[in-house]
Swiss-Prot record:
EC number(s) given by UniProt: 4.2.1.33
Family: Belongs to the LeuD family. LeuD type 1 subfamily.
Protein name, UniProt field: 3-isopropylmalate dehydratase small subunit
Pfam families: Aconitase_C (PF00694)
Pathway: Amino-acid biosynthesis; L-leucine biosynthesis; L-leucine from 3-methyl-2-oxobutanoate: step 2/4
Biological role: Catalyzes the isomerization between 2-isopropylmalate and 3-isopropylmalate, via the formation of 2-isopropylmaleate.
Gene3D superfamilies in alphabetical order: Aconitase, domain 4
């Protein structure tokens, strides 16, 4: 997993509440097992018109938002069916940070396990961040747990374990390898019984 200590990026806002995983990545695009190649289908039914041309009214299609790496959104983001592909699609599109009012528990875990930092902020903070100009950077300071912008600095909470994983770029396998000596000692002990 790629580490995130301080992320500086552009934003795009999609302020809908209850965006479910089928809206994030429709099930018709889940036929591959690789974690890449899903970004082009992110929010597919909203991003594209029936003729597959980009919907000019959809925020991600705005020419001045093409560099966005931070998605600002509503409450209950990632609800619906458990679908790890949704986190893969967000990351493959280039989002490293999602700022929402709340998340589905499973979706939150899928994000953290796949290198997408899910941040929870109240509605008033998200509404202010949503108004930031397209060419303006927002800073995510994970060690100090702050979202820093021209419209304000907003503290956020994150579990210490997840914070450590993001700051050090550790996934579950990397953490397991940190304990490899203890695992080998245990295996030798069990084998000797």
């Amino acid at each position: 997993m790629e580490e995130i200590k301080v992320h500086i990026g552009k934003t795009v806002a999609l302020m809908n509440d209850n965006i479910d995983t089928d809206q994030i990545i429709p099930k018709s695009f889940l036929k591959r097992i690789e974690r890449t190649g899903f970004g082009e289908f992110l929010f597919d039914s909203w991003r594209y018109l029936p003729n597959r041309k980009p919907n000019p009214d959809f925020p991600l299609n705005a020419s001045d938002r093409q560099e966005a790496t931070i998605l600002i959104t509503g409450d209950n983001f990632g609800c619906g069916s458990s679908r790890e592909h949704a986190a893969w699609a967000l990351l493959d599109y280039r989002f490293r940070v999602i700022i929402a009012g709340s998340y589905s528990d499973i979706f939150y875990m899928n994000c953290t396990k796949n290198g997408v930092l899910p941040i929870v902020l109240p509605k008033d903070a998200r509404e202010k961040l949503a108004e930031i100009a397209a060419d303006e950077d927002v800073t995510i300071d994970l060690p100090n747990q702050q979202v820093i912008s021209s419209v304000g600095t907003y503290p956020f909470e994150i579990d210490a374990t997840w914070k450590n994983k993001f700051i050090n770029g550790l996934d579950d396998i990397a953490i397991t390898f940190e304990h490899i000596d203890a695992i080998k000692a245990y295996e030798q002990k069990v084998d000797s019984i």
